[in-house]
A protein has these predicted regions:
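Short strand-turn segments of transmembrane beta-barrel domains in outer membranes
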Residues: 1-30, 40-52
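Short secondary-structure boundary/capping segments within folded domains
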Residues: 31-33, 143, 153-155
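An active-site-proximal structural segment forming one wall of the substrate-binding cleft
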Residues: 161
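Surface-exposed loop/interface segments of Gram-negative outer-membrane beta-barrel transport/assembly proteins
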Residues: 1-11, 51-148, 164-184
Length: 184
C-alpha cells in the first residue's frame, strides 16, 4: 500500500458536510397613532439567520420609539432606537478550507489529538484546515448593544420667535469572546 493512500477508505464530501440549508426569520411589529396634541410610533423586531455554513449564526433584536407632542407654547419629542446583535461567525475561511480538503481525509479520526481528521502535511499538501474541527474546537462570539436617539424641546412664545433645544445620544458596547479548545 502506498503511503499516500493512508485514508483511501474515506470519501468525504466536504462541501456537503460544511454547507447546509439555512433558516432565515424576520419578525416585526409596530404600533402608531396620534391626535391633535401628539403622535407616537413604537416598533420591535427580531431577525435570525442560521447561516449556510457549519457553525455560523446571527440574530438581532431591535426596538424603536418615536413620539412628539404639543402643549401650549411647548413642543417636544424623541426618537430612540435600541438594538442587540449576537454573531457567531465562522472561525476560518470555510469556503476555501472545504475546497482545499481532500476527500480521502476523514472528518473525524480518533488517532489524532482532538479526534478530527486533518491529513499529513508530508503527504497531503492541502493548505487548508478541517473546517468542522475549527468550528467545534473554537468558540467566537460577538455581542453588540447600541442605543441612539435624540430628544428635543421647542418653546415658541410668539409666532416670530422660537427656541429649540436638541440633545442626542449614541452609545455602543461591543464584546468579543473567543475560546480555543484542545485538539487540532
Amino acid at each position: 500500500v502506498n503511503s499516500t493512500q493512508k485514508h483511501s477508505q474515506y470519501d468525504t464530501n466536504w462541501q456537503d458536510e460544511v454547507l447546509k440549508t439555512a433558516l432565515v426569520q424576520d419578525y416585526n411589529v409596530s404600533l402608531s397613532g396620534g391626535g391633535d396634541s401628539g403622535s407616537y410610533f413604537v416598533s420591535a423586531g427580531y431577525y435570525n439567520n442560521d447561516g449556510v455554513s457549519y457553525g455560523n449564526t446571527f440574530d438581532r433584536y431591535s426596538f424603536r420609539v418615536n413620539t412628539q407632542g404639543k402643549k401650549g407654547w411647548f413642543s417636544f419629542g424623541e426618537n430612540l432606537a435600541y438594538s442587540l446583535t449576537n454573531t457567531d461567525p465562522n472561525q476560518t475561511n470555510t469556503y476555501n478550507d472545504f475546497l482545499r480538503m481532500m476527500p480521502t481525509i476523514p472528518i473525524y479520526d480518533e488517532n489524532n489529538p482532538g479526534g478530527y481528521g486533518y491529513g499529513d502535511a508530508a503527504k497531503y499538501n492541502t493548505f487548508g484546515v478541517n473546517p468542522i474541527a475549527r468550528e467545534d474546537l473554537e468558540y467566537r462570539h460577538f455581542r453588540q448593544n447600541r442605543l441612539n436617539g435624540s430628544l428635543w424641546l421647542e418653546f415658541k412664545p410668539f409666532e416670530f420667535l422660537s427656541y429649540k433645544f436638541n440633545g442626542g445620544i449614541d452609545l455602543y458596547f461591543y464584546e468579543n469572546s473567543w475560546f480555543r479548545g484542545e485538539g487540532n
